[in-house]
A protein has these predicted regions:
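Active-site loop->helix "elbow" adjoining a glycine-rich segment at hydrolase catalytic centers
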Residues: 75, 134-138, 166-169
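Non-catalytic accessory segments of hydrolases
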Residues: 1-134, 157
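Conserved hydrophobic residues forming the short capping helix/wall of the S-adenosyl-L-methionine
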Residues: 108, 150-151
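Alpha/beta-hydrolase fold nucleophile elbow
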Residues: 68, 133-134, 146, 153-166
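Short, well-ordered amphipathic alpha-helical segments that serve as non-catalytic structural scaffolds
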Residues: 139-147
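Primarily recognizes the serine-hydrolase "nucleophile elbow" in alpha/beta-hydrolase
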Residues: 151, 158-192
């Protein structure tokens, strides 16, 4: 917690994931996780690009018209990736009058654990649902935060589009299908 304005210009740590090392493979070179990017279990951050705010502190001014909001969910086979990827920087979309938010979520076993004991616990509870899709819940928490707070960044909480690519595309489908998300967003774009 802090008081006043927090000027957050750097990406937070990304989720724990394998790195390609010194690979010269095209995919690793172009989209692989940069070993210089810090990784941590403390990885649940949002990045916001908004054309609505001008300046900082006392000089800041919010546009009077609420802007549409786009929430980005990155891909990477639920194993790698993050909000830091230069290919998915929200600067250009925001320059066109859209508030862009990228949502971080846990990956690999931290986000999508599967184990026979989880199934057994679900059977014992009687609901048949193993609670291990933490990555999807992280995404949902990010979308909910956007819904509750995006107006402070000039965005319209009633005009939210969730979009993603690859595993982010499948995540968008999961978010669409979840009854927990009723009313959190209005539109979706699935890219692969």
């Amino acid at each position: 917690p802090w008081d006043g304005v927090l000027q957050a210009f750097d990406f937070g740590p990304t989720a724990m994931q394998p790195t390609p090392g010194a690979s010269d493979d095209f995919y690793d070179r172009e989209w692989g996780t940069d070993p210089a990017v810090p990784m941590s279990e403390d990885c649940l951050y949002l990045n916001i690009w908004t054309p609505a705010l001008r300046g900082y502190g006392a000089d800041s001014m919010v546009a009077s018209e609420k802007l549409p909001v786009m929430v980005w969910i990155y891909g990477g086979a639920y194993q790698c990736g993050g909000t830091f990827e230069k290919e998915f920087d929200g600067t250009h979309l925001a320059a066109n009058g859209v508030v862009v938010v990228s949502v971080a979520y846990r990956l690999n076993a931290f986000g999508f654990m599967t184990h026979p004991l989880l199934h057994e616990e679900a059977v014992e509870r009687g609901d048949g649902e193993p609670y291990a899709n933490f990555g999807f819940l992280d995404q949902r928490a990010g979308i909910q935060w956007v819904k509750e707070n995006i107006a402070k960044f000039g965005g319209d909480p009633e005009n939210i589009t969730v979009f993603g690519q690859s595993a982010g595309d499948a995540s968008v489908l999961a978010q669409i299908c979840s009854p927990m998300n009723h009313g959190l967003f209005q539109k979706a774009i699935m890219q692969s």
